[in-house]
Amino acid sequence: TRHEQSAAFMAESYGKLTGKLSCCLSTLGPGATNLLTGVADANMDHSPVLVLTGQGSSNRLHKESHQIMDVCNMFESVTKWTTSIRNPSTIPERIGKTRSCSHRFARRHC
């Protein structure tokens, strides 16, 4: 899409209409903040959405650095579960937990 907010709303709509896990992604910083409204809507509608955002290198976290922010903290109040992946070997486990959460909390509206 041309804008992350559109991606979040499209993922929310797909999840809401099908009950299947959908996904949206963004770059770090402003890209992640642009997802926030659509993700909050998905959470309120119990739509299963996996949200992936970029992040700067771990040595830049918790410092004043261009476009670095605490994305997990920002999304915590509008998601069922949030995590940060710092080691690629944990990706399968984290995706598995995401799928488990999506099945528990999803409900069809249409």
Q: Could you say what each language-model-derived stretch is?
A:
Residues T1-C110:
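N-terminal alpha/beta PP-like core and its mobile active-site loop of ThDP/TPP-dependent enzymes
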